């Protein structure tokens, strides 16, 4: 179904059409136009895994709490989840910790993608090091155009069934909520108060791994959430706005 929605969005983009609200394809987790990197450059990044296979990204908030996207945790039990931290490779190295429980934002809506944020509680504490570090939550949004980065292990091309073994990243620029919902871009009123956008010219508009970090100024400003499957300048990637959702994370950590 997800691939159908992405294909539908690409067709609509090519035709200059508008996809009705409610057909909002989630990011399929790809770093297109990205660069291989090491975990020491993104030590807050984790791989969220279902039954041992990479599923989504996430960010270390504390030794026992991970921030990710609510849409990553649909129809899944905590017992099937684990995270790998401290490794540039999702399938080896670093440390693995089981997920004891998780909580989605109570206001998350799979149709509108509002409040697309969740916290994972680990069964054991992470030991911080040069490759395992917590990242702070943004208390305010960066300015429109501010430099940011997105990292993850997503597929490198649309439609690919394989993912890279090594962590990758792309540099992007923040598109403010007000600008992302303006006539400058194609989303209009689908951009809600719990969202922020980012875009990079010449790179896929669906950067990153679902649930993974959008970082600017050394703090977590966004969680990879959704975007239309069309790498056009008028459709930036859309992220859960961490500054807007900060108090929820703190209260549920």
Curated annotation (Swiss-Prot):
GO BP terms: proteolysis
Prosegment residue ranges: 23-30
Family: Belongs to the peptidase S1 family.
Disulfide bridge map: 56-72, 180-197, 206-230
Signal peptide: 1-22
Chemical reaction(s) catalysed: Preferential cleavage: Arg-|-Xaa, Lys-|-Xaa
Catalytic residues (UniProt): 71 (charge relay system), 116 (charge relay system), 210 (charge relay system)
Enzyme nomenclature, EC number: 3.4.21.4
Main localization category: secreted
Cited PANTHER family: AT26814P-RELATED (PTHR24276:SF91), POLYSERASE-RELATED (PTHR24276)
Family annotation (PROSITE patterns): TRYPSIN_DOM, TRYPSIN_HIS, TRYPSIN_SER
Cellular compartments annotated: Secreted, Extracellular space
GO molecular function terms listed in the Swiss-Prot or TrEMBL record: serine hydrolase activity; serine-type endopeptidase activity
Source species: Drosophila melanogaster
Highest taxon of source: Eukaryota
Record's protein name: Trypsin beta
Keywords (A to Z) from UniProt: Disulfide bond, Hydrolase, Protease, Secreted, Serine protease, Signal, Zymogen
Gene expressing this chain: betaTry
Every Peptidase S1 domain range: 31-253
Pfam families reported for this sequence: Trypsin (PF00089)
Gene Ontology CC annotations of this record: extracellular region
Site (Required for specificity): 204
């Amino acid at each position: 179904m997800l691939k159908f929605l992405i294909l539908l969005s690409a067709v609509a983009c090519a035709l200059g059409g508008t996809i009705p609200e409610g057909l909002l394809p989630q990011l399929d987790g790809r770093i297109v136009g990205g660069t291989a990197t090491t975990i020491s450059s993104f030590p807050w990044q984790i791989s969220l895994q279902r039954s041992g296979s990479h599923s989504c990204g996430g960010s270390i908030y504390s030794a026992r709490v991970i921030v990710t996207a609510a849409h990553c945790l649909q129809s899944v039990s905590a017992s099937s989840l684990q995270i790998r931290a401290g490794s540039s490779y999702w399938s080896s190295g670093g440390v693995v910790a089981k997920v004891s429980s998780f909580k989605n934002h109570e206001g998350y809506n799979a149709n509108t993608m509002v409040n697309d944020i969740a916290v994972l509680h680990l069964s054991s504490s992470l030991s911080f090091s040069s490759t395992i570090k917590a990242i702070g939550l943004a208390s305010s949004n960066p300015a429109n155009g501010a430099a940011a980065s997105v990292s993850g292990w997503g597929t490198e091309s649309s439609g690919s069934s394989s993912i890279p073994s090594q962590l990758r990243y792309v540099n992007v620029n923040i598109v403010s909520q007000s600008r992302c919902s303006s006539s400058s871009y194609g989303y209009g009123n689908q951009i809600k108060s719990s969202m922020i956008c980012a875009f990079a010219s010449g790179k896929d508009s669906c950067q990153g791994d679902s649930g993974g970090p959008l970082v600017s100024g050394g703090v977590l400003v966004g969680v990879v959430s959704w975007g239309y499957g069309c790498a056009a300048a008028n459709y930036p990637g859309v992220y859960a706005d961490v500054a807007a959702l900060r108090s929820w994370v703190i209260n549920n950590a």
